[in-house]
């Protein structure tokens, strides 16, 4: 069970890293966008870890949640990672001419 959960997390993490690298490549000529993307991604990792801590707030999680705790953390982390990957992929196709959609500028 834990091996499968870990494998699913690894796959989602690889997909996230791939989407991130694709953005870095696609927008390499937009240094301000790249700079802010890197900041946002570092903050997202902190946010993800804080959400996990909030989801399982115990100081002794293995005692309070039992042996299933590592599985639960991996499942939650996978869910958050998949969501973030979707968010990053949305930046691959900005709607041209829609200023409110944001996006890299010269």
Model regions and ranges:
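N-terminal alpha-helical modules
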Residues: 1-106
């Amino acid at each position: 069970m834990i091996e499968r959960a870990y494998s699913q997390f690894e796959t989602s993490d690889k997909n996230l890293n791939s989407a991130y690298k694709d953005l870095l490549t696609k927008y390499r000529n937009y240094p301000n966008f790249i700079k802010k993307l890197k900041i946002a991604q570092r903050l997202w990792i902190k946010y993800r870890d804080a959400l996990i801590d909030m989801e399982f707030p115990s100081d002794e999680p293995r005692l309070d949640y039992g042996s299933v705790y590592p599985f639960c953390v991996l499942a939650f982390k996978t869910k958050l990672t998949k969501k973030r990957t979707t968010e990053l992929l949305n930046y691959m196709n900005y709607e041209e001419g829609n200023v409110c959609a944001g996006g890299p500028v010269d």
